[in-house]
Amino acid sequence: MDLKDFHKAFDHILNKIKNEENFAFTRFSDGELFILQNKHLLLSNDHYITGDVSGRNIYTEEEQKEFKPEEHQFYREKLTEAFLHNQEGYFKGICTATDGHVGRENFEWMLELHGGDHPNLTYSNLLINANYHRFVEEMAPLFAGRDILYVANKLANISKLPFEIEKTFEIGTNCMINNYNVVEQVKNYIDKNRLKGYIVLCSAASLSNYVIYECYRENSQNTFLDIGSCLNPLLDLEGWKHTRGYLTSYWLNAQSPFGSQVDVWS
């Protein structure tokens, strides 16, 4: 198992799905990084703030969020719990210096917070960038033969997906704060129905980390997969066109460098 090689790590996750082996993959991307660092994080309709850095960009309703350090420490503590948790089959993706806005110092900061490198640490970008075409063409088709739950934005048109969803847990804007109750909803649904062998897809920003941590910790007989915005072009959502280079590269043939970016463990 080589989770530090961008392509081999994808193969490892893909083969687990093919073989119906249960696992969890949870992503600690730049947003989670800033929350762990206790920085103010804001994605608004026309601008962003990350600590002392701010700028202009377009964020549609499904992408908007805000973490206020003075108000939201509970959610930071839960995110830290999820990040520090180690368990067989619990794979955690972190930021690397391949993303220039992250830098090597933040990669090293995450490793230090974690207590050092670990076999279960891999890339937060594992399913995107140069691996994204494989997600669409190799991984997503496997969902058609499985029982699926989906944590997704209420604006998503789930009917457009090329596979069936047994149940959708709808979330809204700033779901990591406003929809924390969904963690218990997912957990209770799994427990009540004694589910085994399901795939739980999560497209819910930092709420995905909470759901995956709390549910997999108690029941590792299902697979939990943080897919971020990977399916957004199929869901009648528009925000990805402004903020997701790997998606515009694949779906719109845009000349974004993210479409061919191979992340490196450094």
Regions inferred by a protein language model and the residue ranges of each:
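Short, surface-exposed amphipathic charged segments that create phosphate/polyanion-binding patches used
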Residues: 43, 182-187, 238-246
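A mid-sequence, solvent-exposed acidic-amphipathic segment
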Residues: 156, 162-197
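C-terminal functional extensions of proteins
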Residues: 207-266
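A generic structural motif
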Residues: 52-57, 168-175, 225-231
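Electropositive, gly/pro-rich neighborhoods at or near active sites that engage anionic ligands
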Residues: 1-163
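Short beta->alpha connector loops
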Residues: 32, 205-207
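Short catalytic-loop micro-motif centered on adjacent basic/acidic residues
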Residues: 199-203
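A short, acidic, amphipathic alpha-helical segment used as a generic capping/interface helix at domain edges
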Residues: 8-10, 74-79, 181-191, 207-209
